[in-house]
């Protein structure tokens, strides 16, 4: 079976079509919003290091800088940093996570001063929306939730929701996902995946990978 994904990016919306043997099997259309909501991913710029807080302020294009603590860089920050350099070196070429190198984990007791530099560009995801006078709260440990699955780059583990109580079903889902998941991705199987066929899960997985290869990228304002 030959799979093909077509992505049409317009000013106000993005359309994604999944074809199998030239036959349309799934179609999605999403609006492009400028709102800073939880889950959005941005190419941000470090604005100010705060050694006393072991944190920094980051510009994601919002009127107020976002807050990023050292611990929210995540264990795979080194891998994300190298990946971003490879992606930005040739913006016309897609560089999937599955082809990226996994570097040693970031030290848990490290500091922003030795890890980040003012003006450095980083990939971030919003985990808390702006409130009143505060900007968004960020993480660099990206996750991509779908209806059935949550994908996590540079991980490898497959976990099944604890709400799926059947040992047989948990084993089935774990074995199934391990057989179809791409390299360099960890997966969390959500409760609603219980009883789903491999075709349904594989279809969502393929569409999720397209979203991941073209993340929302809002250039930080210098």
Model-derived features with residue positions:
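Single-stranded RNA-binding surfaces
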Residues: 1-213, 217
């Amino acid at each position: 079976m030959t799979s093909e994904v077509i992505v049409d990016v317009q000013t106000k919306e993005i359309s994604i079509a999944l074809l199998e043997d030239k036959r349309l099997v799934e179609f999605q259309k999403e609006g492009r919003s400028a709102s800073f909501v939880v889950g959005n991913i941005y190419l941000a710029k470090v604005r100010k290091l705060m050694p006393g807080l072991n944190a920094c302020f980051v510009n994601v294009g919002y009127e107020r800088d976002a807050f990023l603590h050292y611990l929210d860089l995540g264990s795979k920050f080194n891998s994300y940093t190298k990946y971003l350099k490879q992606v930005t070196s040739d913006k016309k070429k897609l560089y999937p996570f599955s082809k990226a190198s996994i570097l040693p984990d970031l030290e848990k007791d490290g500091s922003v001063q030795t890890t980040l530099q003012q003006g450095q560009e980083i990939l971030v995801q919003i985990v808390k929306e702006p409130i009143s006078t505060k900007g968004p709260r960020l993480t660099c440990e990206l996750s991509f939730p779908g209806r059935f699955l949550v994908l996590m780059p540079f991980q490898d583990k497959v976990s099944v929701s604890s709400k799926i109580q059947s040992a047989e079903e948990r084993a089935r889902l774990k074995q199934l996902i391990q057989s179809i998941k791409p390299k360099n991705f960890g997966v969390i199987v959500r409760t609603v995946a219980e009883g789903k066929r491999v075709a349904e899960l594989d279809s969502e997985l393929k569409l999720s990978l397209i979203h991941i290869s073209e993340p929302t990228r809002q250039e930080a304002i210098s």
